[in-house]
């Protein structure tokens, strides 16, 4: 951007549309141009009624002047002025001479010289010989020479309506700029002389011949360019162009390429077309819209717009276009700017009520609460009365007035005049009609009214409370109006609220009437000072949700009342909830059109209100305005603008709040992308449908079922690292059915052996696991044919759930397909799973995970000892062996115990109901014949000795735990190899002894084997080995379940 270029005009706001419709009515027009003034904010708001306070910042008046050229036109100047003045009228004459009857004072007068630009006048000779080589340069030249912020071509709608079939008129003209190809022989002097003679065509030696009839000349003069054919401007493109043209007129031509005419008639614009002074040449404005943006700061000390009976304050924008020629008239337009004054943002008068509490001559105590010190025109004001009669007193009538006093000043406040006070009745509450009145009695007289304090049931004087929603109209009977408060020193408007109570009492056997009058000053604000214009927009969403129905009946409004929930808020005291749900609220108003319409709410007289109330054609009036709070109003609104009743401002930004999106419930999770993988083969089986996977099980497998099934799947007799179970989604294996039948036979024989053992030894169990029995004997011999199919399907579903649970417990990363696998199970099969002793019955602190990443501190610290595992490990030879290194915080050596990593998943460390004896009995219940050798392994206990602070570890973490004799406090605090060898030798000897016993007793029955193993187990609990070594629970009982149980 060149250094001599400056900002020509301010930006137009982004949220406003500056596109002028083709059918819009201009402020002024002629045959060649139209004039529009488009304001960004139709109303300017000032704060505070104290003109002495200047701490509030100035407000901005901004907008644009649009000059629409219909055909090429020469203009001499374009100017825009912002003017404001006050005028007071004095019919009796201004003292002392009384020869002047009007006083006018100027408030503001600011003028923008839009065309010609200032920099163009000083540089017109320098740019006279500058050629324009392209259409972009021609468009930049148009914008620069006209001084506009934005230039737009006319759309084809206007082309079709005003200049039909005239595109080829000027297309044949050769109007290329000087220096362009094909114009070397053009004589500049001849063309200047032709322009002075107002010729409408330019000849060229190389130009083609054409018909110069008047009709063709008219067509050529009014024809548009070909470039803007089929072009429809948008708000986004207009704003971007305005943004670019605001800061520079010499930007890249690509930003304005779509506005540049391509026909040759727009290229004949050089600086010699503009000449100032008499007899000079002027710039030719080509057809299109020339947009001039402007702004003006308005201080808070300026008075607001006032329109009183004997004075007013007015602001307006005045646009003037001067055209050259003696017979060309100037064009001017005028648009009023409305300035409204509202309360300051830190004012508390709106939220501060007026409270009046008095005692009238020890006869009546009353409280009056006026909800606010402000009144908004065409809105409601809540007022509450509370009466407590202290003696026999009669309250005949309640009236509420608003009074207005206008004062005028001139000659620096030396001359003053006050108008008579206007008094407007707003509400009247009358007592009930007295009985036995004559027919010709005047019902408006207070003596003919009953008592408002009397109970209608028994006739006693009781405490009464009345609530009113008083409507304050801006116009009364279409010829009187209530003016808002003013801050201008020469025109003052003051208002008071007046409450009148008509009382009577009996004095000396005569009834005397009294009138109590209560006056209080109150602010009356403009109708646009509602919360929709004074409060910030809501951050939770759109404050007003408008129904689409336009029916004015009360039924349609009530049906759409759910859409108006956000329209009402308790803080918006000026619009009660009853009115917001009534047809009075106009449904046809655009939600964002807040300030433009100024249609007043027409108020009704008392007679017309009574007529409408009693009319059968207005059922909505009977429903809404006959309520206790509204039926006493003298005036009723015919319509209220819906957007003005909003409790907060309506945002103009197209970006909505993210909180509003949270009101919509999220969609159901789609499990269609989840796959169930076969862990054994590593192949993907089938994909679970989203419809089936969305059904979660109502009765998931119990904790006991999961524990037992995990051991059935994981404990293999001759495998050190068992393979994970395979999970089939929808294609069960046929071989699994055969294995399941064999397993069921084995379980039946095992259950018979267990029953014989209990009958012989008469040792009852403390608790019987019904879930295990359901797995062991799901089928009976007497129902093989009738229920075999259903039981097999239920068994398959049960195994699928249990195998899924086993996979989830064994791997922390397998939770992705949990819901997918459960979705394929039927509801009946899921309900068949018992929920007794589920995982919810155990506290999280009593759960021990078998996964090394989620176990106790022993397994967390066990990784450090894996490096020295081969050095300190002493293996025990058994059927199913595994080695685990000792923990850094445990006093027990894991190396001498056969513990597999695949233990019971989610096994509770603390058991509430089971003892070790019962646990062994239950474990042996499902034990096959070839797995009883595991019972001969040393028994362990579930408790862990936390009093032993250190383990026997090669890497000491404390200075006292060293491998020297001086630091060994006990065999458990050091790494004494003698003690280790002695302990392991004893364990090896016991293991050999157990093997011998098993060899000798191989001919015993199964029950005798179980009995002997239980006796050894109980005797081992009291052995002295527990003094030196903390043992773990005998997990071999659950390890020995054969794989054939599947």
Curated annotation (Swiss-Prot):
One Gene Ontology MF term: ubiquitin protein ligase binding
Low complexity bias (residue ranges): 128-140, 168-179, 198-210, 669-694, 802-811
Location, primary (coarse class): cytoplasm
Compartments (UniProt record): Cytoplasm
Record PTM: Ubiquitinated by RSP5. Phosphorylated by the cyclin-CDKs PCL6-PHO85 and PCL7-PHO85.
Region described as Disordered: spans on this chain: 115-141, 168-230, 605-627, 651-820, 868-889, 986-1017
Composition bias, Polar residues: 605-614, 877-889, 996-1008
Pfam families: Arrestin_C, Arrestin_N
Biased composition (Basic and acidic residues): 734-785
Presence of the UniProt keyword Metal-binding in the record: no
Modified sites of kind Phosphoserine: 155, 162, 213, 586, 826, 838, 900, 1022-1023
GO biological process, one term: positive regulation of ubiquitin-dependent endocytosis
InterPro entries, per the entry: Arrestin-like_C (IPR014752), Arrestin-like_N (IPR011021), Arrestin_C-like (IPR011022), Arrestin_domain-protein (IPR050357), Ig_E-set (IPR014756)
Domain of life assignment: Eukaryota
Keywords, ordered alphabetically: Cytoplasm, Phosphoprotein, Ubl conjugation
GO CC entries: cytoplasm; cytosol; early endosome; late endosome
PANTHER family named in the record: ARRESTIN DOMAIN CONTAINING PROTEIN (PTHR11188), ARRESTIN-RELATED TRAFFICKING ADAPTER 10-RELATED (PTHR11188:SF174)
Family: Belongs to the ALY1 family.
Quaternary organization: Interacts with PCL6, PCL7 and RSP5.
Something else known: Present with 49 molecules/cell in log phase SD medium.
Function field: May regulate endocytosis by recruiting RSP5 ubiquitin ligase activity to specific plasma membrane proteins in response to extracellular stimuli.
Name this polypeptide is given: Arrestin-related trafficking adapter 3
């Amino acid at each position: 951007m060149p250094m001599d270029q400056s900002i020509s005009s301010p930006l137009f706001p982004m949220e406003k549309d500056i596109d002028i419709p083709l059918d819009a009515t201009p402020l002024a027009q002629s045959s060649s141009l139209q004039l529009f003034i488009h304001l960004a904010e139709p109303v300017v708001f000032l704060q505070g009624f104290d003109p002495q306070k200047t701490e509030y910042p100035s407000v901005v008046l901004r907008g644009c002047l649009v000059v629409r050229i219909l055909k090429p036109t020469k203009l001499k100047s374009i100017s825009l002025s912002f003017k404001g003045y006050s005028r007071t009228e004095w019919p009796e004459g201004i003292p002392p001479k009384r020869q002047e009857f009007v006083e006018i004072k100027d408030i503001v007068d600011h003028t923008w010289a839009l065309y010609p630009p200032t920099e163009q006048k000083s540089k017109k000779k320098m740019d006279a010989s500058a050629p324009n080589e392209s259409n972009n340069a021609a468009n930049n030249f148009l914008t620069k020479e006209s001084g506009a912020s934005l230039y737009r071509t006319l759309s084809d709608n206007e082309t079709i309506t005003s200049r039909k079939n005239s595109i080829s008129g000027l297309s044949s003209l050769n109007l290329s700029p000087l220096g362009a190809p094909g114009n070397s022989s053009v004589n500049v002097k001849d063309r200047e002389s032709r322009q002075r003679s107002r010729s409408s065509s330019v000849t060229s030696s190389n130009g083609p011949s054409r018909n110069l009839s008047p009709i063709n000349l008219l067509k050529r003069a009014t024809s548009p360019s070909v470039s803007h054919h089929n072009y429809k401007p948008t708000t986004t493109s207009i704003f971007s162009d305005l943004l670019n043209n605001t800061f520079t007129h010499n930007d890249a031509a690509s930003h304005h390429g779509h506005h540049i005419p391509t026909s040759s008639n727009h290229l004949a614009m050089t600086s010699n077309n503009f000449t100032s002074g008499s007899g000079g040449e002027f710039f030719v404005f080509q057809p299109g819209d020339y947009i001039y943006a402007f702004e003006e700061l308005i201080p808070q000390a300026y008075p607001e717009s006032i329109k009183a009976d004997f004075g007013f304050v007015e602001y307006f924008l005045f646009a003037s276009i001067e055209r050259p020629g003696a017979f060309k008239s100037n064009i001017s337009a005028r648009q009023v700017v409305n300035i409204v004054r509202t309360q300051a943002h830190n004012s508390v008068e709106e939220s501060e009520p007026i409270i009046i509490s008095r005692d009238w001559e020890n006869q009546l105590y009353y409280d009056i609460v006026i909800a606010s010190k402000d009144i908004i025109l065409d809105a409601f004001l809540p007022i509450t009365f509370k009466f407590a009669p202290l003696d026999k007193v009669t309250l005949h009538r309640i009236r509420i007035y608003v009074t207005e006093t206008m004062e005028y000043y001139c000659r620096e406040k030396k001359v003053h005049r006050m108008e008579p006070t206007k008094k407007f009745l707003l509400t009247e509450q009358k007592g009930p009609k007295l009985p036995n009145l004559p027919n010709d009695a005047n019902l408006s007289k207070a003596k003919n009214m009953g008592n408002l304090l009397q109970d209608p049931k028994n006739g006693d004087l009781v405490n009464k409370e009345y609530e009113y929603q008083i409507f304050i109209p801006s116009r009364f009977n279409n010829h009187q109006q209530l003016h808002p408060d003013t801050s201008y020193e020469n025109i003052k408007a003051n208002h008071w609220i007046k409450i009148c109570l008509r009382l009577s009492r009996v004095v000396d056997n005569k009834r005397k009437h009294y009138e109590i009058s209560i006056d209080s000053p109150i602010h009356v604000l403009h109708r646009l000072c509602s919360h929709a214009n004074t409060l910030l927009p809501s951050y939770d969403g759109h404050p007003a949700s408008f129904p689409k129905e336009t029916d004015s009946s009360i039924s349609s409004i009530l049906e759409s009342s759910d859409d108006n929930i956000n329209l009402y808020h308790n803080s918006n005291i000026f619009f009660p909830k009853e009115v917001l749900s009534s047809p009075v609220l106009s449904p046809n108003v655009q939600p964002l059109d807040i300030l433009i319409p100024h249609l007043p709410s027409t108020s009704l007289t008392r007679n017309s209100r009574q007529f409408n109330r009693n009319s059968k054609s207005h059922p909505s009036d009977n429903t809404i305005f006959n309520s206790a709070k509204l039926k006493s109003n003298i005036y009723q609104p015919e319509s209220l603008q819906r957007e003005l009743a909003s409790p907060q401002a309506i945002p103009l930004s197209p970006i909505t709040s993210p909180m509003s999106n949270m009101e919509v419930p999220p969609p159901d999770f789609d499990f269609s992308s989840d796959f169930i993988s076969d862990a054994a083969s590593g192949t993907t089986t089938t994909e679970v449908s989203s419809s089936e996977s969305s059904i979660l099980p109502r009765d998931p497998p119990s904790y006991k079922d999961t524990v037992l099934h995990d051991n059935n799947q994981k404990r293999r007799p001759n495998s050190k690292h068992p393979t994970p179970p395979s999970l089939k989604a929808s294609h069960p294996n046929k071989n699994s059915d055969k294995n399941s039948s064999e397993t069921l036979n084995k379980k039946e024989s095992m259950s018979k052996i267990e029953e014989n053992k209990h009958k012989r030894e008469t040792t009852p169990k403390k608790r019987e696991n019904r879930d295990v029995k359901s797995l062991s004997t799901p089928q009976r011999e007497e129902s093989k044919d009738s229920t075999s199919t259903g039981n097999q399907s239920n068994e398959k579903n049960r195994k699928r759930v249990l195998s899924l649970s086993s996979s989830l417990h064994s791997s922390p990363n397998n939770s992705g397909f949990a819901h997918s696998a459960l979705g394929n199970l039927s509801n009946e099969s899921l309900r068949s799973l018992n929920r007794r002793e589920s995982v919810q019955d155990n506290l999280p602190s009593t759960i021990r995970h078998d996964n090394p990443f989620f176990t106790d501190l022993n397994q967390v610290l066990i990784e450090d000892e894996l490096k020295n595992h081969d050095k300190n490990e002493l293996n025990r030879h058994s059927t199913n062996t595994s080695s685990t290194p000792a923990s850094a915080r445990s006093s027990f050596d894991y190396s001498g115990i056969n513990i597999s990593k695949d233990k019971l998943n989610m096994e509770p460390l603390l058991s509430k109901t089971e003892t070790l004896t019962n646990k062994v009995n239950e474990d042996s219940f499902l034990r096959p014949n070839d797995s009883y050798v595991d019972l001969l392994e040393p028994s362990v206990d579930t408790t862990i000795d936390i009093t032993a602070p250190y383990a026997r570890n090669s890497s000491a973490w404390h200075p006292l735990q060293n491998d020297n004799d001086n630091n060994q406090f006990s065999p458990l605090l050091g790494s004494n190899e003698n003690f280790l060898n002695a302990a392991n030798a004893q364990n090896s000897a016991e293991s050999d002894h157990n093997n011998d016993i098993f060899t000798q007793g191989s001919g015993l029955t199964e029950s005798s084997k179980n009995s002997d193993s239980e006796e050894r187990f109980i005797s081992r609990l009291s052995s002295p080995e527990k003094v030196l070594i903390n043992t773990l629970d005998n997990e071999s009982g659950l390890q020995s379940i054969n794989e054939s149980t599947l």
